[in-house]
Every structure is written in C-alpha cells, then in structure tokens.
Amino acid sequence: ADSIEPYVIFFHSTTRDEKHWPEREWRNLIEKLTALSVQVRLPWGNEKEKARAKRLAKGLSHVVVLPKLSLNELADQIANAKAVVSVDTGLAHLTAALDKPNITLYGATDPTLIGCYGQNQHYLTADAMEKITSGQVFSTLNLLIK
C-alpha cells in the first residue's frame, strides 16, 4: 500500500453512533474519487471498525483496508497522505497536529468548541450527520488534493 500515490485517508469510525457518517455516503465519496486516480486508505482500531472498513472497500479496487497500525504507524500514514476526511475523533486532532489537509464532519457537536485548529483544517457541519452529503465533502476534498 505504501507505493501507490497519491492517497487520502478516511477516519470513518468513532466511539459514539451519532458521530458516524452513513456508510452509503462514505461509499458515494469513495466512488467519486475513482475518476481522480486517488487511492483511499481505511484504518481501523477494533473488529467493528475493521468490518465497517471492509464494507466500505468491498468491490472497489482503489480502496485499501490498512492492517492494524500503531499510533506511530498511523501518524506516518497521515504524514504522507494528500488529505484526510474524518468524523469527530481524536485522530482528526492528530491530523491537525501534523498539519495535513483535513475535512472533519460534525453533526450535533459544535466544531467551534472542540474542533481541530490550523490553516489546513476544514469542517462541514449539519444538525445531523446524515444531512452532510458526499457531494459537499467531495467538492471540498477535490480542492485540497489538486
């Protein structure tokens, strides 16, 4: 997986269900990236997240479900990525600390209170996660990876 460039990372999992973005939107976003020749890498931290990553990647050749990674290994993946898309998770803050372009998706959580800071940090927000569309995310991501 390390030899293919460029790539983006999707942090698709978080601890609270209301902070998850619908899998259909992740799939739609992944499919939109096909035309850009950008690989999508999906990390995971537990078996539930691994199962989600496999569902998101199913049947798509430009998607890699990463092996279980340490935090240092994950930081290396972030450091070499073109951009990151994440739900509200601590890994979004790690991305900000590494100054990588990041789009964080927020539902009921107010990003002005707990959001990531830095010039490369972007966020999309709605009163519910399912109201954020893959089209909105793709429009922003497309600008970041050009």
Where are these regions (language model features)?
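Short glycine-centered, acidic/aromatic-flanked micro-motifs in structured strand/loop junctions
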Residues: 12, 42-44, 126
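Tryptophan-centered motif/residue detector
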Residues: 16, 21, 26, 44, ...
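Short hydrophobic-acidic sequence motifs that mark active-site Asp/Glu residues
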Residues: 7-9, 41, 123
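Short, flexible loop segments at the rims of nucleotide/cofactor-binding pockets, characterized by
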Residues: 17-19, 61-65, 126
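Nucleotide-sugar donor-binding patch of glycosyltransferase catalytic domains
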Residues: 55, 65, 93-146
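Donor-binding and catalytic core of enzymes assembling or modifying cell-surface/extracellular glycoconjugates
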Residues: 23-111
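Mid-sequence helix-capping/hinge segment at a functional interface
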Residues: 1-19, 23
